[in-house]
């Protein structure tokens, strides 16, 4: 193999495939990238067996074809430090990867490329086009997915007639799906998909699912990820249906107010929300720092016999995630009592957030479960779904 490629082009390709590089120490071969030179392209391929990425680079000169397998992160580190010019890459008679750029010379040891896992194959006619809405919807629900890999069925985004994600404390639902059927896409693969969608190169995306593997591709890019083999909880039963209190609030001013009041909140962003007929008072306090309070105008519909403010405790960071996932100028918050989740929605999405328990004897908000460090308390949100 012998090619000449611009340093920038090569580095961009390595950046694309780096997220699917294997980290398992028991399978060191997965820490490699496979380079394949054919005609006028250089193909880069990495996989950790669960996720794989292939990208074809075209802005280069292929002098002789071939393929090689080498340490991906070491190769990227070398390319990053080279000057912005052309890089000559070839294999020598021992199969080592030789790189030359101006006065720099590198020799990188390699492994037999035939030992690297092969790419899954799928027929072209199984793919169907997807629009930018697919990426928008994924982005709008991703925040609610559990970050705990041990809760594997929640460490994902559920794709069906709706897009759904939950971690037990909050839930995001997009009502307008793409006709997928009961797919659990791992969160780490969702993140890779969204990074691909952020690259504005004019490419048209296509997707398909085959043999429990989700594929996404463009002309020069192929992503694949193995789906989670499990069941997503029946989320419909925990959607509040009898909320009698409604607040209509300007979204951006609410975001700004939460960010300010959250500065004085505890480590779990506990905040108190007091709803009056025409105003909302946000407050927080920290035993070590002090407290904060802010009032803003809202349209609040209270219950008929209500003569006191309706007060609830919320995780400000979680509510902020919801508000930032919405697009409208105004947002509707539906509330029931001081124990039931709130519901926030717009035309296409529904977001649910558990409340924190208010401790009346203290000027602060505490969660129902003791929290140590950054570990979130278990919520009966998911327990209720899984029990039925």
PLM features per residue range, with description:
Residues 1-388:
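Structural preference for solvent-exposed beta-strand-turn elements
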């Amino acid at each position: 193999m012998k090619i000449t490629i611009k340093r920038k082009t090569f580095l961009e390709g390595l950046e694309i495939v780096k997220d699917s590089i294997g980290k398992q120490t028991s399978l060191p071969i997965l820490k490699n990238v496979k380079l394949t030179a054919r005609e006028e392209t250089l193909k880069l391929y990495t996989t950790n067996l669960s996720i794989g990425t292939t990208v074809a680079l075209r802005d280069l000169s292929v002098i002789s074809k071939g393929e090689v397998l080498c340490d991906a992160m070491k190769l990227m580190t070398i390319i990053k430090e080279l000057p912005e010019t052309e890089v000559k890459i070839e294999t020598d008679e021992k199969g080592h990867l030789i790189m030359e750029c101006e006065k720099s010379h590198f020799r990188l040891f390699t492994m037999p490329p035939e030992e690297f896992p092969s790419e899954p194959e799928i027929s072209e006619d199984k793919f169907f086009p997807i629009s930018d809405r697919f990426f928008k919807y994924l982005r709008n629900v991703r925040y609610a997915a559990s970050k705990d890999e041990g809760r594997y069925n929640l460490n994902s985004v559920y794709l069906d007639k709706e897009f759904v994600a939950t971690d037990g404390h909050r839930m995001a639902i997009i009502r307008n799906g793409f006709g997928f059927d009961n797919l659990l896409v791992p969160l780490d693969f969702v993140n890779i998909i969204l990074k691909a969608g952020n690259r504005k190169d004019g490419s048209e995306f296509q997707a398909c699912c085959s043999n429990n593997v989700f594929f996404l591709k463009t002309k020069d890019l192929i992503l694949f990820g193995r789906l989670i083999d499990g069941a997503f909880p029946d989320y419909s039963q925990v959607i509040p249906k009898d909320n009698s209190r409604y607040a209509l609030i300007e979204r951006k001013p609410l975001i700004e107010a939460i960010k300010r009041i959250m500065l004085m909140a505890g480590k779990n962003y506990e905040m108190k929300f007091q709803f009056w007929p025409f105003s909302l008072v946000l407050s927080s306090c920290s035993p070590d720092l002090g407290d904060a309070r802010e009032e803003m105008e809202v349209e609040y519909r209270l219950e008929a016999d209500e003569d006191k403010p309706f007060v609830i405790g919320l995780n400000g960071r979680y509510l902020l995630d919801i508000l930032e996932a919405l697009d409208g100028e105004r947002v509707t918050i539906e509330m029931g009592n001081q124990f039931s989740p709130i519901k926030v929605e717009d035309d296409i999405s529904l977001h649910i957030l558990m409340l924190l328990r208010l401790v009346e004897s203290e000027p602060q908000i505490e969660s129902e479960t003791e929290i140590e460090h950054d570990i979130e308390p278990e919520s009966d949100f998911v327990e209720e779904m899984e029990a039925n």
